[in-house]
Amino acid sequence: MEHVTNIAYPHFAINGNLSYEYLFTHELSHMWFGNMVTCADAGDMWLNEGWATFCQYFYKHDLYSSETYRQEMNENHYDILKNAHITDGSYLSLDEVPTEYTYGTTVYDKGATVVHSLMNYLGAEVFFDAIKAYLQAFAYAPASSEDMRDFLTNYTGRDMTGFFGTWVFTPGTPHYSIDSAQVTTVGDEFEVQLFLRKKHKGVDYIGGSHQFEIGFMNANWDIITDTVQFDGLHGHSTKMLPFEPILVLADPFDRTADATTDESFTLDQTGEYSFPKAGFRLYADQLTDSAWFRLTHHWVKPDSLKIPVNGLRLSPYRHWEVSGINLAEQDLRGRFFYSDGASLDGSLFESTNDSVVILYRQNPADEWQAIPQYREGLWNIGYVYVEELLPGQYTLAVWDTQIVGLSENPVSKPQPEIKAFPNPTQGKITFRWEQKFSGSLIFTDQNGKISLVIPLENTNQIEVDSSRWEKGLYLIEQKNPKGQAVAWTKIVVL
């Protein structure tokens, strides 16, 4: 806890190792953010706590590595996108946080990601120089978000109205994407016409002075970056490159904490690859060559159907995008997790009449369409398997059996029943099925995380103690030795 010239540090954190190194950094940072300059009122507490939280991440950039900082900031950002509006009651702006959430997730953790985005918006050199000057200008005095905005505008020569309007004064999180890219050969160079999009997670907001980094990758997987700026919901930018880009990426190095989470890697071995933050699993069944794979989880609703279909609802909350190099030549499948939990798909599902499917389009110019798939699980929690995973965008949707034209979508077939009792439960729960079985019982929580795996050996009953589990909905799958789900049920832990 910060007190001027006397920062309190808990005894338990002095334990002879580095496990509380982050806390030491956080509290020490209050010598500047909180003591030297303090927030003008409690609603602006992010100027104290958000900046100290940023410091507790950023010190690892220099002490350990830039990749360590990037990974830990990304973990923090993922938690904000998924949970902050739940733990803090709603989407909150940073400058007017209610007193009951003064020390909540938005102030601390989202505050840190906004500082991260501000650093990359200005550039690190300008950012650190400007913040040192800000601390001197307001030394031993209070400052508000408006004060910081105006000071940075005057000091850097850049109008910070747009940035603060989008990131500080508006609830939710901006979302930036590339709608399309057109490449033309011009002599020995390549001209790239970029068409850009802006959305917003949580609230409807347009804003201006948007900026994010673009990555251009060639056939050898070399990448160069440049920055784009635009106002409003749509933008355009022209870039000249020394090589022909095979792939154009939004924010490839996570320098802007917008409403996306991304994971990328080199795909050079067959097998399963898990993307827990995105609720996705990749199955590489056969590879003809190495490939570069990227999955983006967009935490905003997908574009609407160009021609509405009565009774078909697309997710109002999220969608996925698969991109990469050499992907079309590979034999790939994908598994998408769905759950009506509040942090994922609660706004999509309405009743047991809903039947979940995955829709696909190659790019934003195309219409969403049905693709071969099958489902494992229940109407409100489970997985959808896509039999042929191609580059493009994927979204959850729900439909009923009366909709014409979607009956070809395969859904889960009736499976042997797993009985669970008592259900709901607060402690021990028994699972029973008709015939003895060998394989495993997989427990997945409502966020898509596997919480328990129990081996089964020639048995038709098992008892589990759930007394220490987190409350919520769980999907239970019975899988044979080949990893195929043969039965499932759900339980509620109170």
Spans of model-derived segments:
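Short acidic/polar inter-strand loop motif in beta-rich domains
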Residues: P252-E263, P481-A487
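Residue-level detector of functionally pivotal "anchor" positions at catalytic/ligand-binding pockets or at interdomain
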Residues: T266-L267, V398-F421
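Beta-strand-rich binding/interaction modules
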Residues: P174-S177, V183-D231, S237-L247, V356, ...
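C-terminal beta-strand-rich structural cap/linker in extracellular carbohydrate-active enzymes
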Residues: P242-D258, Y383-I403
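C-terminal outer-membrane/trafficking sorting elements
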Residues: P410-F421, T425-L494
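Surface beta-strand/loop "capping" patches
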Residues: T166-Y205, D268-W292, L314-P316, G324
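Hydrophobic alpha-helical and helix-loop surface patches within well-folded domains
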Residues: M1-F195, G202-V203, V248
